[in-house]
């Protein structure tokens, strides 16, 4: 209902002022909405903004459309407080199974995320990409968009040539129980060590790259088999984090289907294209970049950038909105891609850049073989969660404690990563992420479990009758925050800022816990008891829906 009442307020102000921008802001602790439009009117009317605000309040309050909205002036500010009907309608709506789901849209969205090179396991540095991307996918789906999640699979670059050389020459046996990505990274790390000790083997990597580009069948099979083994392991890791991609798209596709050459032919017509022998590059210095954006090497082989351009043209043909999630170290590459697509008259992707997540312990690098994998992070978090669950619920069987610990661990990792704005770096802290008493995923999951427990107890006591009458400040604060969920979801997809939802659901858990503490539910009587149980049910469902968008399991018992 919050979105609808925002629009109603905007319409009232536009009609009263004749202005398009009526300067609506959040009302903070004093109101549901506020407007500073009196400042804009003061410039033309040559009046004190506070006087204008008072006059507008009189005009607005007299309108039939303002029924149920308390409108007042505080100095130059106009405050809007939504009344009992709004609260009742909001709580009623929040009890629907599909609460928060927005009307179906027709614009298709493709979100590419994770896309780590298949030369080893995902590490902690990769999974911020994964969590941000998957949360956006879930948010767009909840917001009514047809969405496809894609993973761009590098199956021909230099790093993959090193993997292929390792598989071809080292002949390691697969250890029982070893994941595919773990198996492949052993070849990759050892091949790099050998190359460092014996630089004379470097031309063998170059030869493999030339063969894959030429489509040599034996080399193609070697590369694809190696990549597929690693990708299977990566998919297992993603699945353990509640992440599924709709499509894995091979980079070689755009080399062999002619689309890369097609885009290079179009670029050839630009006046800023240059050649040195077989090398081809764009001079993007007038666009604010370095003067060489290389698209073909001196030996005639293509580079990643050329294939990436073809990939984005292919995506554009299938969607109305293309979104890439990339690390901050890809800002230059991303900007060059966007600029080049604009130069040939094509739509550039929207890019969500993120700073990196790290651990207090050490660095992460695949090439050197020193890294903390996503699997290790989740396993360690699960181990620590199991210890906490065992202390809190020793009466539960081990299987039940394992189930809770896994959900808590995945939730802790996902939430601790997504709660921070993408443009800010963050350090994953186990103690903070697993704190049941503070603003973490377990804290929010526990709020949901508490709401479920209250509803179960009410059912055992004979149930309750729906009631939507609220006056207590803790009731009203909780109900009005519940009403904002669809609005926050819309804001996430418009601004591509998933941390907004993480903040919203944390605040919802806070408000619910305050309500639980200061507004007794099961011990209340009559309509008060019924109304509070109705509100608990609405909060339970809102927590469930919001946690679902965050990819976190809403536990019914903890």
UniProtKB/Swiss-Prot annotation:
Subcellular location: Cytoplasm
Key words of the record: Aminoacyl-tRNA synthetase, ATP-binding, Cytoplasm, Ligase, Nucleotide-binding, Protein biosynthesis
A GO molecular-function descriptor: arginine-tRNA ligase activity
Known EC number: 6.1.1.19
Membrane-spanning intervals of the chain: none
NCBIfam families given in the database record: argS
Coiled coil regions in record: none
Gene: argS
Designated name of the protein: Arginine--tRNA ligase
UniProt cross-references to Gene3D superfamilies, sorted A to Z: Arginyl tRNA synthetase N-terminal domain, HUPs, Isoleucyl-tRNA Synthetase, Domain 1
Similarity comment: family membership: Belongs to the class-I aminoacyl-tRNA synthetase family.
Species of origin: Methanocorpusculum labreanum (strain ATCC 43576 / DSM 4855 / Z)
Classification via SMART domains: Arg_tRNA_synt_N, DALR_1
Gene Ontology, cellular component aspect: cytoplasm
Reaction(s) this enzyme catalyzes, per UniProt: tRNA(Arg) + L-arginine + ATP = L-arginyl-tRNA(Arg) + AMP + diphosphate
Main location: cytoplasm
Family matches, as PANTHER family: ARGININE--TRNA LIGASE, CYTOPLASMIC, ARGINYL-TRNA SYNTHETASE
Source taxon at top rank: Archaea
GO biological process, one term: arginyl-tRNA aminoacylation
Cleavable signal peptide: none
Residue positions of motif 'HIGH' region: 116-126
